[in-house]
Amino acid sequence: MRRREVLLFLTGSRVRHVRTGVDSLIGGYRLNLTPSEPLGLWRIEALHRPVSIGDLVFFCPPMTAVFDEARRRGYVRRGLCAGGVAPLIKTVAALAAQNVEITDHIVIDGRSLPSSVVRKTDGEGRVLLPDPGGVVPPHHLFLHSSFASSYDSRYFGPVPDSGLLGLARPVFTFDP
């Protein structure tokens, strides 16, 4: 009888834990465990205006071969977005119709983007292929993080704005 009580308790605890996690996801909260932005709890805030350069946003990556490879390499975590990946937090660096040049760093409409060195290899020595750059297509965003090893539009290119979930607002965060 004692074993059954313990199993019921553990099952109930697990259900409560999962329920709390699901409620947080539905409630617009996300846990950031990547160094691209401060670690901790973030909230997704609905965007009631057009997205702007400098906005820190959550977005769901599109289901593309580039993101399939990113998931295989461990650049993106598993999550609830289409394709089974977690939403990413990035800063909007360029909007549709802006020209992005990608060489050893990023230049947007003739102006260098700070903290935008383009790496040739990742932390494990694997080749990183930069996006070729060009004009950001309609309904797309070029996203960036100032974290040197960030996986962002330097490598995956502009993303459809349909994947935009909202503004990223820190709730309880810290820099490692």
Curated annotation (Swiss-Prot):
Keywords: Conjugation, Periplasm, Plasmid, Signal. GO terms for biological process: signal peptide processing. Its main location: periplasm. It is found in: Periplasm. The keyword Signal applies. SUPFAM superfamilies: LexA/Signal peptidase. InterPro entries: LexA/Signal_pep-like_sf, Peptidase_S26, Peptidase_S26C_TraF. Gene3D superfamilies: Umud Fragment, subunit A. Pfam families: Peptidase_S26. GO terms for molecular function: serine-type endopeptidase activity. GO terms for cellular component: periplasmic space. Involved in conjugal transfer of the plasmid. Belongs to the peptidase S26C family. NCBIfam families: PRK13838.1, TraF_Ti. This is Conjugal transfer protein TraF. It comes from Rhizobium radiobacter.
